């Protein structure tokens, strides 16, 4: 008789995805971030659900309701800080996951990669709308500045902004709809993650050598299920250290002041995980140009499969590409730092140089490095 997990229609799907899935025998800890992202999403959905039971999406009471959660709800402070820092953790894992994909050439699984880019946009939209909900100073002004960027779109721009606002400024209608979207989007993200996995399991996982691994596969369970579990435990240790000891380290002090449309904060900036894109936006002294650069800073990821010139998939044995990759990582860290600085010399020129370098490495230097390496290896 066949075992139930192999015959039952529902369990069969779980079995094929998480138990009997043939996986390469040599995938490293960089492959743990996919499962960690799943854990992050579950943390966010669960903490978000409990927060929504006590939160009110009204401009008069939103800020007070968040204070009430922290002061009066049993373990409300813990749920709130888990949710706020869970977003940061989500993006840390997300950026590591994308970096792994770039380094090891995983982007050559085009469908999986493109669904991943859509997922990135959805997560960014969700995080942005979530940041508006506490209705602090940075919530209000961040929402005003970022939504206002759409007014740079020719002809329909200003109408589009008013349509998103639901009025003539960021107000009650905006807060209400942002709450609705912020609640529904994580479930759409979960569904898209399933599609992401579906496409991945069509091809099987890549591996650090970037070579076909069909000749040497091992079952996902128990090998990688326990490896993922260890990753989750390390993640939790890191997560709860931040939540319990440094809960406000990644937040903005301005968001502890209630939103005031009559008082502009000296430096309007988004959360740390958007600062690199914000720096690219600010480095162009033209509104429409900045918005285009902002969109391209993420959309440029879609070009990776087209710009792959090397005859090897992974960067494991490609030293020139490795140097380019780590310069790109350093450049992103510099952009993140610049995004949090005021718009004044020398930060302006550093931001512009870092933005040019960002696009140059991806569009020009990495493909050239691939061609040089082919030549050196006489391929």
UniProtKB/Swiss-Prot annotation:
Which GO terms of type biological process are on file?
mitochondrial electron transport, ubiquinol to cytochrome c
Q: Where in the cell is it found?
A: Mitochondrion inner membrane
Q: Which residues bind a ubiquinone?
A: 201
Q: Does the keyword Iron apply?
A: yes
Residues that hold heme b b566 according to the record: 97, 196
| List of residues binding heme b b562 | 83, 182
In Pfam terms, one family for this protein is Cytochrome_B
Annotated PANTHER family: CYTOCHROME B
Instruction: Give the UniProt family note.
Output: Belongs to the cytochrome b family.
Q: What binding partners and quaternary form does the record give?
A: The cytochrome bc1 complex contains 11 subunits: 3 respiratory subunits (MT-CYB, CYC1 and UQCRFS1), 2 core proteins (UQCRC1 and UQCRC2) and 6 low-molecular weight proteins (UQCRH/QCR6, UQCRB/QCR7, UQCRQ/QCR8, UQCR10/QCR9, UQCR11/QCR10 and a cleavage product of UQCRFS1). This cytochrome bc1 complex then forms a dimer.
The miscellaneous remark of the record is: Heme 1 (or BL or b562) is low-potential and absorbs at about 562 nm, and heme 2 (or BH or b566) is high-potential and absorbs at about 566 nm.
Q: What is this protein called?
A: Cytochrome b
Protein's organism: Perognathus alticolus
